[in-house]
Amino acid sequence: MNKIEILKSIKDGLKIKEEITRFAKEGWKSISEDDIQRLKWFGLFLRNPTPGYFMQRVRIPNGISFSYQIKALCSIAKNFGNGIIDITTRQQVQLRNLKIEDVPEIFTIQEGVGITSIQTGLDNVRNIMGCPVAGLSSKEKVDGYSQVKALTKYISGNSEFSNLPRKLNIAITGCSDDCIHAETQDLALVPAVQELGGNTVYGFNILVGGKLGSGGYRIATPLDVFVIPEDVVKVCSEIILLFRDHGSREIRSKNRLAFLIEEWGEAKFRKALQEKLNDKLTPSGVDLRSNQKSEHIGIYRQKQSSLSYVGLKVPVGRIHADKLQDIALIAEKYGNGEIRFSHSNSLIIPNVPDQKLGGLLQEPLVKEFTYHPSSIMKGLVSCVGIDYCHLATIETKSRALQVAKELEDKLPDTESINMHWSGCPAGCGNHLVADIGLLGKKIKQGNEVVDAVDVFMGGRTGIDPKLATKVMEDVPCDELAKVLQHMVPYHTREKMHPIKGKKYKRNWKKASLAIPLEESSSSEKIKPRNQNIDIKPLSYNTEDTVKILNSKGWKKNSNGWLEKETSYH
């Protein structure tokens, strides 16, 4: 039994709240190592880079919050933390540099405005994601937000769900836009329609077993189950309990739901679920998701008459509490006080009447966190990085901004593209489902150890999901913009997945991965790789690139680009 299972067997993580007042009086050094782990049941993480200071991960179901809640969080960040708030890829926020002495007061403030950090860490159901424009978009086929709220209420603080083998990520969406990365979730519900008793019924298809991070990557697979909205909590809770009772509890990197699905297979898992429900399961309906992808950044008409929502880009998701507090005031002035967080490190101000839209767009903060960023900045996502995460190998947020700004200058007319940074294999930046994914690492360059990345391309979620392929290794971050400058124009989303007629053709396999050969010595080290060539990802530092590529069938064409024509069947 691993050490986390041992400490859970001694005391349920939820019981640690009874000890927090004592910890606050005695200081962080009085907290045992086991209790440091148990504090994660309440979203408190003692970070190695900042001894004595905690990060708090706040649960915000579906990313939907209100101005009074945001103002409370901003006050906490300024008065008890370092004044910085990070918007995460799970639609929640993180506060930093908090002292255990202040936690009781922090909890009191948060409880007073209806927010909590309960079960946002370790072996629990994490913040449940949903479409950030649920209830607003005309593309919504079925109400997903109500199900997110109901399931969150059912599992939060419930000891039936406080001792899972590993964390469980859930997403529920009723929208046709592919915005929640359903295939990366342990459990996902996506909009579907089914004929039941001669009636057309809208509900959800269920996907299980997706994961990014340690232990390998896996795309969630259909369970062949359709569920009506009224049964979502019942069915999802039984899936969670199946995982609780049958998931492996040995090697931590092999304990996710994905490994139970791999061991049992979807058919056995479905049968076990049917037995627990004591009811016949309905087969999957027609998946109502489109091939379109949206970061929900921009100005969009709501399905409610004369109202719009405005999606603002917060570069790499980091914002000072003073500015977020002012945005909360803007949401009150021009909307109804709602603020929503998206999966792409951004925020949304909904319910803006037509007559107020012009005034909103003139606000200095709306111009700073713009609703019309460049294509490169719009799709930029980053994990926290080494500044605050002990797992990260490089600083991602500042690197991501630096590279993006360089590419903006060099490629002002670039088409839509997603560029995601992860600082370690845990993959919190979702680099494996991006057009271009960047995974941080350290490499030795001469006598120095420098920040570098492996480059992945062609990832996507949705009705035709695919994990990105590693195409290049060991690219120093200081030279990354120069490398990507030649990749981006030929590998934007439209280039990788061209649109033909009304259907979105996924014909990456028919396209060559073309990378230019510059005359500079550094460019000669760049190693492109076609998706289906049977060679390993090419090292940035390998010598004799052209010779190697020519031996594999790559040739320089009339435009000075390397490409390879490959037959596909």
Annotated model-derived regions:
Residues 1-508:
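Peripheral terminal and linker regions in Fe-S/redox and tRNA-modifying enzymes
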